[in-house]
């Protein structure tokens, strides 16, 4: 029986195990498949392992300290150390650092991530070597707008970074030798020392190239203005010959000697020639493509590709007129000079120069070198009489980084890395990074596009703009004689801007005949007199006659050497004023050296991506579509030309376009005056244009752009197609007492100058005034900043999640809230200790500043949840993880084995809801089933949601969720507990059957089979055994019966055989005798058998053995087993 039980157990146990295994598979099939959770890497065992940010730094040329990062794990990229850039999360935890000086570490990071997030080296040849980065410094970064895991880093040659110069108040005494003789004075020409600086002239003992010209004035005549003006037409260029620029006849005012010769372009270029830059990688900027993968804790970033930028990439696309040699052999368009010394200056009227140049009119085919954009007047752009891209200009143009889908752009910098007004950006570099393969990183291609061709579509709609004065000198002709150069504050293109790139900058203008002045209406006072009045002066410039009429507009030399000079100027041809269509302006005879006005526009990214690599005259029409709309550009006010002078430069108190449009605005409404009022009047350089930032306006439902201009925050509306040019542009002047100021001073007719922004010496010497090349500021006095602020102290614009914009300076922040402001107020945030950097993190309603001498950061945040005022938290962040938990709490997804199977019995569509803003989130009733969250102590009721960042819609395959909490109106991702990484998690296995269905469906057939087998084994086997035993028993019994029968038969047979026939008769008697003894008849046969000796004894055995058949009953006990 025990053997039978053992056999049954052995038979049933495998079946039971199969059933249990099936049940386990069914249950586990309802659990989530957690694919690639971010929180699985980079976790920290304790909060004490937080990595603090190193010392942050700023690169002024591109206004860069940090980049706010969007995506699954938001935060920032921050310039740190002396050469590096660090990636931090929202709370200051350092995730990784890119150090170009550590090439050994970078070498191991060259490659790509495979499907398993493993860093894999390229199997083929790699065209770059990270060892070339050892001579570079990271100065800027951007995030690819299409792939948030891809960053592009801009690295600059160490040689350029080491040249960064400390800024100073932009006043004359800080830049020029005030006691130098007047270089334009005939008496001083022989002994004058050539100067550098703003003009970039030859240093003492240098070559023969003359210093750049200052600005003699020129009269620009409106076409068909009056009878007097109409008779004044330039002499045909074919009959006139230009004079040598360095001859005694050339009386163009020369710049004064620089106070610091290191600020001259020659010193800055330092022998780094254009040819050397193109061939030596250590002198080139480079863009590095970095791929971030936070699933890989060992290698959180990979160096995927690199592209070196060469100045040749830009020069190769200069228009043909820019690269042609001189046609007249003298590289100038000056024909002659009229010497004049007017003794009858009128007090408070306009500036008049001593020498009046007459210039040859520029034609569309004139080589640029023969206009006033020549090696003499713009030496900073020439090398060996060739218009190229020297070192100073090349480094300046490396800035303004932007990237989308592998197309990377450099829109340029503002040039403030050096104290040279001519350091400006001339165009846009475009680098295409091709897709990588497993074998190679992909090819790169860099081309450059000058702004002269990208902005060639500038035009205006006269019916819409209604210009009161003359259009600005921004128009382009088919010969491309206007050479715009920009001080670029920055660019921005949020995802919602449809690929339109907003450009915030200041821009140079073109001029008439090479002179820096280009107004048609306001010029020296003498020109406002009768248009045909002439004066006569002798060769010394002394007035001989006045008021006499001349029969011709051409000055006539007298026999005594005297010369008649018209009050109206001889340069009567038009200038490059903006026209109603592209490329139909008059050629610009010259180009200003400095930026003249603010300038914003929008460029179309799709067009920039598709532009031909090579610009030619034949395909120039394609480039005219680079602008979103040629009519959509702004100078910060109405599109008029400038007044020649102003006495109200520091009285700029206007905030809006509507205020500037009023008659009370006067000179303040002029675009040139606005730029000067915001910069030079406060001691800033006109190139002091800050970084561009953006906010989404809840009032207008549009983006608003911001950038710093000297001592003011300016706001600009989003530029769109058919956008109204009257859109509001706001100027937020920062606290006036903290910045420098210019005030008018007592003046007389002979001292009508200001030394505030005068880079050039008047031809009449110090007593007659200084002229800066574009706008003349009357006699004034300058008061430096009470805080000692220069552009060096500007640390950048930052924004907060609650739409605050903060201008950060070393000693204070200045905050505005445009969506809430109706009175245009600025709130000051005092910093108890000077700051060295401001770090922008767009996702929080706060930002970070780094105090001087500290390696940690402090928070600038709201005073309280009920207040919009910001304040600096005096406590340094020493534990970023604790700081994070105090703000948003912490959480973690529940282990897969602990999630109830009922969660996966739902369809994805049944557990997802849509919020008012259109985002999909997990239904709140399911959150506790899969996520455990601990809120911050001071905000226990903070709102938590699980954002759907990816899911299958057609099927119920998967859903990916990201935990977020609502902080100050913005949802912020919640990192995994004790980790620097945000955790998004993927779940699969939805629309599963109830937990009991599958186990039951599998178990019931198995149980039935098992029962059947058990019954078959438990009943069938014993029955079979009993039957067999019965058969054996019957066989034995039958055998014994047969034996007995045979024995009995044998006995009877013997008896019969022994009885003879003779005894037959006796037999009845014997039978009868037996019948008489019927009662004892059964026993009687034994008696005779016993008495007989032999024969009768054998039959007796069968007679006793008939009981033997009962023995087969012995197997009967087996029935008890049943």
Swiss-Prot record:
Pfam short name (any one): P1_N
Keywords noted in UniProt: Cell membrane, Cytadherence, Membrane, Signal, Transmembrane, Transmembrane helix
Main location (coarse class): membrane
Gene Ontology cellular component terms for the protein in this record: plasma membrane
Stretch forming the signal peptide: 1-30
Bias kind Low complexity: ranges: 1079-1122
Annotated stretches, region: Disordered: 183-209, 244-273, 544-563, 1066-1122
Protein's membrane topology: Single-pass type I membrane protein
Transmembrane region(s): 997-1021
Biased composition (Gly residues): 195-208
GO biological process, one term: adhesion of symbiont to microvasculature
Subcellular location: Cell membrane
Amino acid composition bias (Polar residues), ranges on this chain: 259-273
Function: Could be involved in cytadherence.
Family: Belongs to the adhesin P1 family.
The protein's name: Adhesin P1
Organism name: Mycoplasmoides gallisepticum (Mycoplasma gallisepticum)
Organism ancestry: Bacteria, Bacillati, Mycoplasmatota, Mycoplasmoidales, Mycoplasmoidaceae
Encoding gene, per UniProt annotation: gapA
């Amino acid at each position: 029986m025990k053997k039978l039980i053992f056999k049954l157990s052995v038979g049933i146990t495998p079946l039971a195990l199969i059933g249990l295994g099936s049940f386990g598979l069914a249950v586990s099939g309802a659990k989530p498949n957690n694919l690639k959770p971010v929180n699985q890497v980079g976790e920290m065992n304790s909060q004490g392992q937080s990595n603090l940010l190193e010392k942050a730094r700023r690169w002024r040329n591109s206004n860069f300290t940090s980049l706010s990062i969007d995506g699954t794990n938001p935060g920032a990229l921050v310039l740190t150390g002396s050469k590096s850039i660090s990636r931090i999360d929202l709370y200051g935890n350092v995730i990784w650092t890119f150090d170009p000086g550590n090439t050994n570490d970078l070498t191991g990071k060259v490659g790509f991530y495979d499907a398993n997030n493993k860093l894999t080296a390229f199997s083929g040849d790699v065209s770059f070597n990270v060892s070339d980065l050892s001579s570079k410094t990271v100065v800027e970064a951007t995030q690819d707008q299409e792939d948030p895991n891809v960053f592009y880093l801009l690295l600059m040659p160490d040689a350029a970074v080491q040249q960064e110069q400390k800024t100073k108040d932009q006043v004359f005494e800080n830049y020029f030798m005030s006691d130098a003789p007047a270089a334009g004075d005939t008496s001083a020409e022989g002994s004058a020392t050539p100067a550098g600086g703003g003009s970039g002239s030859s240093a003492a003992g240098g070559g023969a190239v003359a210093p750049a010209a200052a600005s003699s004035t020129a009269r620009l005549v409106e076409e068909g203005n009056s009878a007097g003006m109409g008779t004044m037409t330039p002499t045909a260029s074919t009959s006139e010959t230009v004079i040598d620029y360095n001859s005694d006849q050339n009386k163009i005012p020369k710049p004064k000697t620089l106070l610091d010769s290191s600020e001259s372009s020659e010193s800055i270029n330092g022998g780094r020639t254009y040819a050397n830059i193109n061939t030596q990688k250590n002198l080139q900027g480079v863009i590095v493509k970095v791929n971030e993968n936070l699933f890989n804790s060992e290698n959180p970033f990979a160096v995927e590709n690199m592209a070196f930028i060469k100045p040749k990439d830009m020069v190769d696309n200069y228009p043909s007129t820019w690269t042609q040699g001189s046609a007249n052999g003298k590289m100038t368009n000056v024909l002659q000079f009229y010497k004049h010394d007017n003794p009858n200056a009128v007090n408070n009227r306009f500036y008049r120069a001593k020498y009046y140049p007459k210039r040859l009119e520029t034609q569309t085919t004139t080589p640029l070198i023969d206009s006033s954009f020549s090696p003499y007047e713009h030496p900073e752009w020439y090398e060996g009489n060739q218009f190229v891209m020297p070192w100073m200009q090349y480094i300046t143009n490396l800035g303004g980084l932007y990237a989308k889908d592998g197309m990377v752009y450099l829109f340029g910098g503002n040039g403030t890395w050096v104290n040279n007004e001519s350091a400006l950006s001339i165009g846009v570099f475009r680098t295409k990074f091709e897709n990588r393969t497993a074998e190679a990183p992909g090819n790169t291609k860099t081309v450059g596009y000058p702004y002269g061709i990208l902005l060639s579509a500038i035009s205006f709609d006269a019916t819409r703009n209604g210009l009161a004065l003359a259009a600005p000198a921004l128009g382009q002709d088919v010969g491309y004689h206007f050479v715009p150069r920009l001080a670029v504050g920055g660019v921005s293109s949020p995802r919602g801007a449809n690929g339109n790139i907003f450009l915030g900058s200041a821009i140079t203008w073109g001029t008439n005949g090479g002179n820096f002045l280009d107004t048609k209406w306001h010029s020296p006072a003498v020109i406002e007199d009768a248009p045909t009045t002439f004066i006569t002066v002798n060769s010394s410039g002394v007035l001989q006659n006045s008021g006499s009429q001349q029969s011709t507009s051409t000055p006539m030399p007298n026999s005594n050497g005297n010369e008649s000079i018209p009050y109206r100027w001889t340069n009567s041809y038009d200038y490059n004023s903006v026209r109603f269509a592209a490329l139909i302006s008059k050629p610009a005879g010259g180009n200003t050296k400095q930026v003249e006005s603010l300038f914003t526009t929008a460029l179309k990214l799709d067009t920039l991506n598709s532009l031909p690599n090579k610009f030619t005259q034949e395909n120039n029409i394609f480039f005219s579509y680079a602008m979103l709309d040629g009519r959509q550009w702004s100078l910060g006010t109405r599109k008029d030309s400038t007044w020649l002078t102003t006495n109200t430069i520091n009285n700029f108190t206007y905030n809006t376009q509507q205020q500037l449009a009023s008659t009370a605005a006067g000179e303040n409404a002029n675009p040139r005056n606005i730029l000067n009022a915001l910069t030079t009047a406060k001691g800033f350089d006109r190139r002091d244009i800050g970084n561009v930032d953006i906010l989404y306006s809840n009032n207008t439902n549009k983006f608003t752009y911001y950038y710093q201009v000297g001592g003011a925050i300016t706001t600009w509306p989003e530029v769109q197609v058919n956008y109204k040019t009257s859109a509001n542009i706001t100027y937020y002047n920062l606290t006036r007492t903290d910045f420098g100021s210019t005030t008018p001073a007592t003046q007389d007719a002979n001292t009508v100058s200001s030394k505030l922004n005068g880079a050039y010496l008047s031809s009449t010497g110090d007593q007659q005034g200084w002229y800066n090349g574009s706008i003349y500021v009357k006699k004034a006095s300058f008061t430096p900043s009470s805080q000692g602020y220069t552009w060096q102290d500007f640390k950048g614009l930052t924004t907060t999640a609650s739409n605050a914009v903060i201008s950060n300076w070393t000693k204070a922040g200045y905050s505005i809230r445009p969506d809430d402001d109706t009175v245009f107020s600025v709130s000051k945030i005092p910093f108890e200790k000077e700051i060295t950097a401001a770090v922008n993190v767009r996702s929080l309603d706060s930002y970070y500043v780094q105090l001087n001498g500290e390696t940690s950061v402090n928070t600038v945040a709201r005073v309280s949840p009920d207040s919009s005022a910001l304040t600096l938290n005096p406590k340094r962040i020493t534990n970023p993880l604790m700081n994070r938990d105090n703000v948003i709490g912490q959480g973690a997804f529940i282990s897969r084995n602990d999630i109830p199977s009922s969660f996966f019995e739902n369809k994805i569509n049944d557990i997802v809801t849509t919020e008012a803003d259109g985002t999909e989130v997990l239904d709140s009733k399911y959150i506790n089933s899969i996520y455990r969250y601990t809120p911050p102590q001071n905000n226990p009721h903070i709102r938590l949601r699980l954002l759907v960042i990816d899911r299958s819609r057609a099927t119920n395959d998967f859903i990916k969720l990201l935990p977020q909490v609502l902080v100050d109106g913005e949802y912020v991702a919640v990192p995994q507990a004790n980790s620097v990484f945000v955790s998004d998690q993927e779940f699969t296995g939805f629309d599963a059957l109830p937990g009991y269905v599958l186990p039951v469906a599998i178990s019931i057939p198995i149980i039935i089979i098992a029962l059947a087998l058990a019954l078959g084994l438990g009943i069938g086997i014993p029955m079979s055994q009993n039957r067999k035993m019965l058969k054996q028993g019957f066989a034995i019994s039958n055998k014994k019966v047969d034996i007995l029968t045979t024995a009995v038969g044998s006995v009877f047979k013997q008896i019969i055989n022994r009885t003879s026939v003779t005894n037959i008769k006796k037999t009845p008697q014997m039978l009868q005798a037996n019948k008489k003894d019927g009662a004892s008849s059964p026993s009687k046969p034994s008696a005779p058998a016993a008495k007989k000796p032999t024969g009768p004894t054998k039959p007796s055995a069968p007679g006793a053995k008939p009981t033997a058949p009962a023995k087969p009953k012995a197997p009967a006990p087996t029935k008890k087993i049943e």
